Amino acid sequence: MAKIINVIGREIMDSRGNPTVEAEVHLEGGFNGMAAAPSGASTGSREALELRDGDKARYLGKGVLTAVANINGPIRDALMGKDATAQAELDQLMIDLDGTENKDKLGANAILAVSLAAAKAAAAFKGMPLYAHIAELNGTPGQFSMPVPMMNILNGGEHADNNVDIQEFMVQPVGAKTFREALRVGAEIFHSLKKVLQEKGLSTSVGDEGGFAPNLASNADALAMIKVAVEKAGYKLGEDVTLALDCAASEFYKDGQYDLTGEGKVFSANGFSDFLKSLTEEYPIASIEDGLDESDWEGWAYQTQIMGDKIQLVGDDLFVTNTKILKRGIDNNIANSILIKFNQIGSLTETLAAIRMAKEAGYTVVISHRSGETEDATIADLAVATSAGQIKTGSLCRSDRVAKYNQLLRIEEQLGEKAPYRGRSEIKGQA
């Protein structure tokens, strides 16, 4: 038995200079695991609660000492002597101990950090890589694939200080034969884009996720810049590389309308979906995330109806990695893909349940980072372990993003042909 003998919580810093929670789980025999909880900027209103102290005299109220105390107190007491390999039981213990719908007593950040640290400790106990252990927990032992990266090379919205409304403009190297090659393609395009921006006298400062954040006149201008960068890097847009957007539309949804201040335009729900569709007709956009507000289910139905057969429509704020909400979406034919973020739901077990539900319904899965990240690279292992098919973990800049890509390189090296890179076929509507 992988007996837990200690659980430790601490306050560390994330990539935006805000505190977050780190946990360690120690087992008999000297095995241990350590993990950190990420934090989002544009968050869905139904996400599990990230517990912050609210003491304005300390870290502007963003301290996490209460969550840390919950780890070092009640969570530690509940898990002492338990088997770290029994992940579902550990997670349920913490969920029951919290006793609330959205983990607002102990904090999803506290529960998640311990949940992931326990998984890492259990993997160490079993003498296997984390991805292999998670695959066993997922009921898919030995089944792996390398994810297609969604590389956020140009930022707007809440992730940048500019006048671009759409939050993320991404490239997906779908024509690559391996993950290593896909990463190289993305890196070359990133550097090409930097040169294109410099030549136009535009800023090459970067946003939270490492993408450039220039002031552009419109969202279409951002796509045009990326098109030039892809071609200058020597690749064919639509063939070697497809584009993806994260609109984060909840951020500019006001009074039932979509107010694109950067564009100087206001759209109805259907009007904004039509606007996005027009962009997909002009550029090879294969995936659109949060193309409407999380509460605009009627609008989502229309968007799915007009684009769902050809374009991957990803629910992030819409589904918040929550099986109850995802089931409603599946039953009502809303979207066709889900973004998976550990900290939206707050435990590894619940995350795996959401991935399984999505796959069983024929929805694609995109494993995602948050804008506030750490050096923790667990999402890389999760993507491979569940054969998710896609990963979204920022640009080719900032070590908090690159850490995940580097872990994927290591995993691909270890697994070789056992973890194929399937490219375009992983994206809904592109097979």
From Swiss-Prot:
GO terms for molecular function: magnesium ion binding; phosphopyruvate hydratase activity. Pathway: Carbohydrate degradation; glycolysis; pyruvate from D-glyceraldehyde 3-phosphate: step 4/5. It catalyses: (2R)-2-phosphoglycerate = phosphoenolpyruvate + H2O. (2R)-2-phosphoglycerate binds at residues 167, 341, 370-371, 392. The keyword Phosphoprotein does not apply. CDD domains: enolase. Pfam families: Enolase_C, Enolase_N. The keyword Cell membrane does not apply. Mg(2+) binds at residues 246, 289, 316. Binds a second Mg(2+) ion via substrate during catalysis. Its cofactor is Mg(2+). GO terms for cellular component: cell surface; extracellular region; phosphopyruvate hydratase complex. The active site is at 209 (proton donor), 341 (proton acceptor). InterPro entries: Enolase, Enolase-like_C_sf, Enolase-like_N, Enolase_C, Enolase_CS, Enolase_N. Keywords: Cytoplasm, Glycolysis, Lyase, Magnesium, Metal-binding, Secreted. GO terms for biological process: glycolytic process. It is found in: Cytoplasm; Secreted; Cell surface. Its EC number is 4.2.1.11. Belongs to the enolase family. Component of the RNA degradosome, a multiprotein complex involved in RNA processing and mRNA degradation. Catalyzes the reversible conversion of 2-phosphoglycerate (2-PG) into phosphoenolpyruvate (PEP). It is essential for the degradation of carbohydrates via glycolysis. This is Enolase. The lineage of its organism: Bacteria, Pseudomonadati, Pseudomonadota, Gammaproteobacteria, Alteromonadales.
